[in-house]
């Protein structure tokens, strides 16, 4: 991650690119962008952003979604793919959290001013949802 290490990596990539592609194509390349893998903290922040988007949709019904750190770790264990980066996180949250909250709304298990807390049921090794009627809309 040091500037010298990054520059050395960039040069190695350019060498491979030059050996693989024709000069006509190389003339069209302006630069090579190098990415580093996302860290654990950054992935947690991405989950927070996804949950914030879901909360934006739930706000009109005066419902708040809270995801515990343990549940976030569970999401990362089940959804993160080093090859795909953070992309699978959104789909996983939609499939396993947002869909369950939607079912709860349709079953009228979430009255207005409710908080849905997502945690991990350790004995079953899956997500659990608890409802508390305490959220006050602003």
Curated annotation (Swiss-Prot):
Task: Spell out the InterPro entries in the cross-references.
Answer: Clp_ATPase_C (IPR019489), ClpA_ClpB (IPR050130), P-loop_NTPase (IPR027417)
A single Pfam family, by name? ClpB_D2-small
Swiss-Prot/TrEMBL keywords: ATP-binding, Chaperone, Nucleotide-binding, Repeat
Q: Key word Chaperone present in the record?
A: yes
The Gene Ontology biological process annotation of the record reads: cellular response to heat
Q: SMART domains recorded for this chain?
A: ClpB_D2-small
What Gene Ontology molecular-function terms does this entry list? ATP binding; ATP hydrolysis activity
Any GO CC annotation of this UniProt entry: cytoplasm
The UniProt record lists the keyword ATP-binding = yes
| Highest taxon of source | Eukaryota
Family indicated by similarity? Belongs to the ClpA/ClpB family.
Q: What is this protein called?
A: Heat shock protein 100
């Amino acid at each position: 991650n040091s500037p010298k290490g990054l520059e050395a990596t960039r040069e190695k990539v350019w060498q491979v690119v030059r050996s693989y592609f024709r000069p006509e194509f190389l003339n069209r390349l302006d630069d090579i962008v190098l990415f580093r893998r996302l860290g654990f903290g950054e992935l947690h922040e991405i989950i927070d952003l996804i949950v914030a988007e879901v909360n934006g949709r739930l706000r009109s019904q005066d419902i708040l979604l809270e995801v515990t750190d343990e549940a976030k770790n569970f999401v990362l264990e089940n959804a993160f793919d080093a090859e795909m980066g953070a992309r699978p996180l959104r789909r996983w949250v939609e499939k396993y959290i947002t869909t369950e909250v939607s079912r709860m709304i349709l079953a009228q298990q979430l009255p207005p001013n409710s908080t849905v807390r997502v945690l991990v049921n350790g004995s079953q090794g899956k997500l659990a949802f608890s409802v508390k009627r305490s959220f006050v809309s602003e």
